[in-house]
């Protein structure tokens, strides 16, 4: 990244912080802050949470909201310039006033063009459902459209640093959740954590033997069809490990994709969270139960890799270190594992290392670059 890009990136973080404050100031005791918040609200009234343009607010957006945004961008850029000058090593990254002026001129020209284009730009695209955002660093229309659906989240304007820091790259608001293994150690912990994150959220447990088994899933369909997130937290180290950890998981995901009904309160892609294990990478050390568990988890990996790149769902692969549960003792609790997983998800992660050993970090490279895509996805 060149020096002007460094100024813009740093300035973006300052702008995003002010942007976040605008969304918090609509009920401020200070009239001026409420006034600024109201002006910015015109932008959201113009490009609505349904990702449509409302022409009724076109003039307020062009001549009030966009000029305010430009002023705040310039202030953020100046602050970013000051910060970059303070931290940039002399002789390595020179950040000069020329870089500052280049960035400001670019912002003025860009905003002028957007105003002349009736307030439309590449970050404001009409979607029925926002597609999956595959860029981990820079903000594009996929990410920014989520901000218009959930105005208090997804604050990034150029880079996603603010959302990483504050955990605003995700929300559970309005999402219906189904979970298998909800009575297990991790399942109970994640349900408890989700209840705290979003009080009143709809979390339904799919019970093994009642709602589904390894070969029968019909009773699970009503829940699957009315869910936005499917969490697969069940697991087995017994003789049925492959059926449970691999084959049944694949079947549940495919049924979820096939039968899920769109939720007007949550116009985003459906999500699948699969709870894997660091045993995907490290050896099983001769224990028969661990060998069965390792084999079943590794058999699922090609399917997981295919789901990870599936444009129709957001697939999150959770890779925890061993945690204390009825399946075995460990140093840390399931509550810690659940809290760590949610911390990562709040920051938009899709590969989620829940680790105190570091193995899950190494497993990331295996998962992304060594695991082949499944060849039999349509035959399962």
PLM-predicted stretches and their roles:
Residues 7-174:
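Membrane-embedded catalytic scaffold of the fatty acid hydroxylase/desaturase
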Residues 177-196:
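N-terminal Rossmann NAD(P)H-binding glycine-rich loop of SDR-like oxidoreductase domains
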Residues 180, 231-233, 268-277, 314-319:
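Structural signature of the Rossmann-like NAD(P)-dependent dehydrogenase/reductase core
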Residues 180, 242-246, 288-302, 330-335:
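Short-chain dehydrogenase/reductase
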Residues 215, 243, 247-258:
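Conserved mid-core alpha-helix of short-chain dehydrogenase/reductase
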Residues 217-247:
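NAD(P)H-binding glycine-rich loop region in Rossmannoid oxidoreductase-like domains
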Residues 254-257, 261-312, 324-325:
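Catalytic loop of short-chain dehydrogenase/reductase
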Residues 317-318, 325-379:
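C-terminal helical subdomain
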